[in-house]
Amino acid sequence: MLTSHSFPPLVIRGRSLLPIVQGGMGVGISAHRLAGSVAREGALGTIASIDLRHHHPDLLERCAQSPDRATLEQANLTALAREIHAAKALSEGRGMIAVNVMKAVSAQADYVRVACESGAHAIVMGAGLPLDLPDMTQGHDIALIPILSDSRGVALVLKKWMKKGRLPDAVVIEHPAHAGGHLGVTHLADMHDRRFDFVRVLEELETVFTSLGLKRDDVPLIVAGGINSHEAVRELLDAGANGVQLGTPFAVTEEGDAHPNFKRVLAEAAPEDIVEFVSVTGLPARAVKTPWLVRYLRQETKIREKVGALKHACPTALQCLSVCGWRDGIEKFGHFCIDTRLAAALRGDVANGLFFRGREALPFGSAIRSVHDLIELLLTGATRPSVAGRWAFFLG
């Protein structure tokens, strides 16, 4: 556990943490081993709630014997409870264990309920405006952390939640031009809009807080997307952020829950290997151009023209998304089974998987290092390697 660094702590619901947050990554990329290891260092580790049954052979066997929606959903809820308990045990009482729940997921309320009942310390929710999250967690002592991308979204959530007598315990501000996975914009062309620049959002939120009668320290602000160095952390905290969130750099650590092939694909990707596209959720997304994705994007226009408006049966029977371009026949959305592709990536199936990744270089280049090494590098600059051709992060 790192004890010597120069940054103030990130305080969330009375817990004093290192100002480092590990982002939630599904399917199964951030499960108990990664989240628990991050928390054991004194930071905030996050379990991605979606489809965790893939880490549990007995649950997969049960689903194979009864491949219906009810069985699959119950298996995933059981897996989530197991992962939370395992992460808390691994953390040895340090740090904080959060559960990430996507607003776009059909079973969001059940995931939130199980997270609360299983002793998670926080719920993190993105992929949509989590306006009803305080209602879903009524009666539970749990931190609530929405993920948003601009000051307008933060202001809306603050106003709605304040009417319910609740403030967010922190807010993650994710920059769509840098982050991996699903991005907080409506259209691909919007991701580089200046309204998402970290400094601008932090400055605008000073005004928002004042207008709502809030003090700046009432709600910690955590910035996310492209952060890959001690210098970037210092610059962002000096600019007014209370913490930083990273996803891809944690996914490729030794403790990351994915197959080694998954880590190699992310760690060895060059800038030209990373692509943005429209997911089946309708949201823009960022991933590595692996063989399946290259084929899909090459045929995307033809797929939309031929079957884009046709509804299809869910290939897994899980019905994981509340709105799905493939299942619901929404022509402008993506047209593939995202659960199948993400599960393939988790297993290390390079040919068939969908490998979400952030845009920027990784702190250790293509090297696979430990969670401790990553946090130490981010907070102190120690053990920083000399990586030829490493791309720099510039604060926007």
Region roles according to the model:
Residues 1-215, 393:
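Active-site entrance/lid segments in N-terminal catalytic domains of soluble metabolic enzymes
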Residues 29, 227-228:
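Residue-level detector of alpha-helix initiation sites
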Residues 21, 178-198, 202-218, 222, ...:
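Conserved active-site-proximal phosphate/metal-binding subdomains
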